[in-house]
């Protein structure tokens, strides 16, 4: 299958997930599949919960990129995949999977998809979402406490210990691999319309319809 694969990266809380969903809304239901890089965090069944809480989830080594690369190649070949499901509250991969069928456009979003060379090479179009650090930490606190069952203290401690230093070491530098840098992610209406128009033109050029 002649898919178009788009990579969206950016710091935690930058608005990259919102951007991905806003882009999807501008296409038909069967035209786009969204895949979160977070789903491919490595499994750590061998570790107790207290130890899993201490792991660095913002380092490139935290991800099973080999599995994601395999899955993207399967989708590109026209074959469905069983995508992992990640349980944020338990800091581990769930026993459940999500069945995903191929589609003309595949969007992979996360903090580090542009930082892994082999993974990055699969993307036909690469987007980096650039958002002010203060805004990102506020969004992260609200999201992790409300949606992921985290305590305020744990979110702040993780931000200081790994999120901020890993952003500076790996996430921010990965924007040099982007084809375009978008400020403020999902809140940037004009940029979303511009991206949607560009993606449509890429689809037409690739004759994916």
Show the residue positions of the predicted features.
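P-loop (Walker A) phosphate-binding loop of NTP-binding proteins
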Residues: 11
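Conserved lysine of the Walker
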Residues: 16
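Conserved nucleotide-sensing/catalytic segment adjacent to the nucleotide-binding pocket
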Residues: 33, 42, 46-90
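Phosphate-binding/switch loop-helix module in NTP-utilizing enzymes
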Residues: 71-106, 113-116, 206
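NTP-dependent small-molecule kinase module
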Residues: 101-102, 142, 164-209
């Amino acid at each position: 299958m002649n898919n178009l694969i788009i990579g969206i990266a950016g710091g935690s809380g930058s608005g990259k997930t919102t951007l991905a969903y806003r882009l999807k809304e501008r296409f038909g239901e069967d035209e786009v599949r969204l895949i979160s890089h977070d789903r491919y965090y490595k499994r750590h069944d061998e570790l107790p919960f207290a130890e899993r809480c201490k792991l660095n989830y913002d380092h490139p080594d935290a991800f099973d990129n080999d599995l994601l690369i395999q899955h993207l190649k399967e989708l590109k070949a026209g074959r469905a995949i069983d995508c992992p499901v990640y349980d944020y509250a338990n800091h581990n991969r769930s026993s459940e999977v999500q069945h995903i069928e191929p589609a003309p456009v595949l969007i992979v979003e996360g903090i580090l998809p542009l930082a892994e060379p082999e993974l990055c090479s699969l993307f036909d179009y690469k987007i980096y979402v650039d958002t002010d650090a203060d805004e990102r930490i506020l969004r992260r606190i609200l999201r992790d406490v409300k949606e992921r069952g985290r305590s305020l203290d744990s979110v702040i401690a993780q931000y200081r210990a790994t999120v901020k230093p890993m952003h500076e070491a790996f996430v921010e530098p990965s924007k040099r691999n982007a084809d375009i840098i978008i400020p403020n992610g999902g809140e940037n209406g004009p940029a979303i319309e511009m991206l949607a128009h560009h993606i449509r033109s890429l689809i037409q050029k690739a004759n994916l319809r």
